[in-house]
Amino acid sequence: TLTKKIQQKYQNFKLSVSLTTRSPRSNEVEGVDYHFVSRTYFEELVAKKKFYEYAKIFENYYGTLKKNVDETILKNDIIFDIDWQGTKQLSKFKNLNLIKIYLITINKEELKKRLIKRNQNTKEEVKKRFNSFDDDIKHWNDYDYIIINKNLDVCFKQIEKIISLNKKRISISSHIIQ
């Protein structure tokens, strides 16, 4: 929701569509939410060094193709909706001029509540996300900005301020975006 809101207000911001080996959820669209690929194909791309970043998260791979990013940044600013592992890898590429924003829920219970309310994850996925919270939050200091994601409108206003201050490419990592 938040990335869509950013794109609606800022026409020059495009979402980097990641590749993943996981199955699509019922509401996801190929090429809009993710590019859904086989594990074999993903591993071939890794071997050929085609990714700016990739990570294995809960038994599935996610990654950002260099080609897609390089084509996008010629004309637009780009939003990466990725976790801390991806952000850490992308940070090595200075040409991307990242402004790193970490969105975090207030606490683990709120994360669990939002994941269940979103109704897009299995019980097992919710449990894994819940259990990884403490480890994930340890990486907050790798970011330029930390935003507590309590309210969508407040969160969006904070991101607007960051955009106006920086006018650069932005990486948004989060436990959950409403």
What do these predicted regions represent?
Residues 1-12:
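A conserved segment at the C-terminal end of the G1
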Residues 20-78, 84-85:
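ATP-dependent small-molecule kinase phosphotransfer cores
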Residues 86-89, 155-156:
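Short, well-ordered alpha-helical microsegments
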